[in-house]
Structure formats: C-alpha cells, structure tokens
Amino acid sequence: MLRLSLVAFLSFFLLAEVLNAQHYLNPTRFAESPVPPAPDYSDSKNWCALPGRVDEADKTPKGHRAASAEAPADVFYIHPTLYSDEPKTEFKWNQDVRDPDLNRQVDELPIRYQATAFNAAGLVYAPRYRQAHYSVFLTPHLDDKKRALDIAYADVEAAFDYFIKNHNQGRPFVLAGHSQGTLHAAHLLKHRIIGTALQGNLVAAYLPGMPIPADSLAGLPVCTDSLATGCWVSWRTFRWGYRPIAPIGDGSDPVCVNPISWSYSGGVKRDTVQGYVHRHHHKGAALKPFGRIYRHRCDAGSYRGVLWVHRPRFPGSFLIRSSNYHAGDINLFYMDVRHNAALRVQQFAVVRGS
C-alpha cells in the first residue's frame, strides 16, 4: 500500500520538477521549425473541457459535486506546459493540437488535477492551444522564446474571444491558469479584460506558478482576503527556506497570496515570513489516484514573494529532495482553491445584487 501511494505521489508531484535543462533545450531555432495549424474553436475537439459533454474537468473528489448546468458563473482555465519531451514531430517549438498523446497527458494531468478545482465555482471551459515547448523557459534565444509564446497566446486569445461571444453571454467568470497558462492569462487580463466591460464580470483571476509584480496588472487590484472579487491572486510554492533567483528585473518581489488563508502582505520587503498559516487550516491536497483528499498536510507562509511550505506530509514524502514545488502549486491546495473559488462566486452575486 505504501509503495503504491509513493509511486502515485511521486509520479504527479514531480511531473515538472525533474526536467533536465540540457535534455530539454531545443537545439532547433524557431525559424527552422514549421508552425502547426491554428485550432478552430468552433470545433469542440479543440477544447480540453467544454460544458455539455463528459470530460476530465467534470471529475470531483469523493463527496463533492461539480456545478450544475444552471451554475451562475463560468470558468476559463488555461493549462500549463506539458510539451517538454524531445519533439517527435516536425513541430519543435509549439504543440500540434492534433497530437493525441500530448492531448491525453493534458487531460489526465492538469485538467483532472487543476481545472477540476474550479468546477464547483462554475462551468469549466479549457482550450487546447499550441502551447510553447518547455525550451522557451531555458533558451538563450529570446526572439525564439517570444515567437513561440506569441503563437500560444494567440490561440488562447482566440479561444477566449470565442468563449465570450458564443458561450459566456455576459455571465460572471473566473479566469485561471498555471505556469505557462498563467502567462497567457495575465496577457488576457491586459489585452482583453482590464478597462473593458468584461472587467465588470470578472469574479477573480487565479494566476499561480509565475512571478507577477503587483503593478503589472494596472487597473486590477490584488485580492487581499478570501471574499474580495474583481481582483487577482498569485503564488509560487517552494520548500521552506528556499530562495529562488529573483526573476524580476527591477528587483521587486512578485505577488504572493497565501492559498490557505488568502491573505496578502502587500509586498512588504521583510526578511521574515508573513502571514504564516498552520497545516491544521489546510483544507486538502489532491494526488493520484484522483478522488482522495489529503487534509491538514501543508502549512504556508509568504517570504519575499514566494510561498514557503514545510515538506508536505504524504506517504513517501520524506524521499522528496527538490525544493521547487511548482508542480503542486494548485493540487497541493486543491480543496482550498476549490472552496475559495466557489466562495468568491457567491460573494460576487451578493455584491452585484446589492
């Protein structure tokens, strides 16, 4: 039993932590690689999750339910990078959305273990897109990085526009992403939401897994508590005491909202942990096999723009040596996110109705 639990835990939790930079560095320049065709979002096969059909985004932990078809809100979710192996096709920098093996990985990992965290808050929409290869985060060729990410974002923007026009119909919505998905979600906020009529329908944006400075989304505040709406949250999870290299050029600390308490220290630059929350307040993590919830396993505190947690208490977790818990940004706090997203949707309805 312990062996099975350990294998299941490591197989998911370490998904994005064991990437070898040299192995995954794409030797092909962007200009030498063809670009896969853009997806048509009027075709349902170009969506990982779509209400009205059965897909991985419908799954729920034991004892919980997804929102009904009459749910008052929608969720637009953007998955993280799964295109990380050495490409087996001619498309080296962006995924071909017709790739069945990669699509299956997306469905069985981030859609099942991340997107479902939001299905109590509303109806989940998640597009397939020409995600940029993991190499974009390693390559020294910044022009290649930009071109690959621009292609990925163009798909996300097209999917969002289609979602708004054909599905959302003016309803409140939650925006969520992780890692590369968070990059694209932040661009959506800047280019499609902030300063438009859509901003009035935004319940909240969940943007974990990437460093985002507080002033980078001008016109949209950071959520400062568990009930705030029309705002955004972000965090990046590391083992207690680990200090990642500062990724922001001006030396500022990125936003870190504690996903257990949903408190925000306001970016105060102090060499002490802010807003520490004991693991007894942790609502639960989701690991393989999907369905079981592990409660009271994580504590959390904010330090200089990152979320510190002591090594989570799971079967076999004593073997974890990595200090980067990026792969667990959402599923480590699965029930905390699930409860909070639904709570903000409820609060949004109260505020709008007042």
Task: Report each predicted region and the residues it spans.
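Basic, amphipathic N-terminal segments that precede the first structured/catalytic domain
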Residues: A21-A66, R104
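Surface cap/lid and interfacial helix-loop subdomains adjacent to catalytic sites
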Residues: A152-Q169, H191-F318, S322-Y334, R338-L343, ...
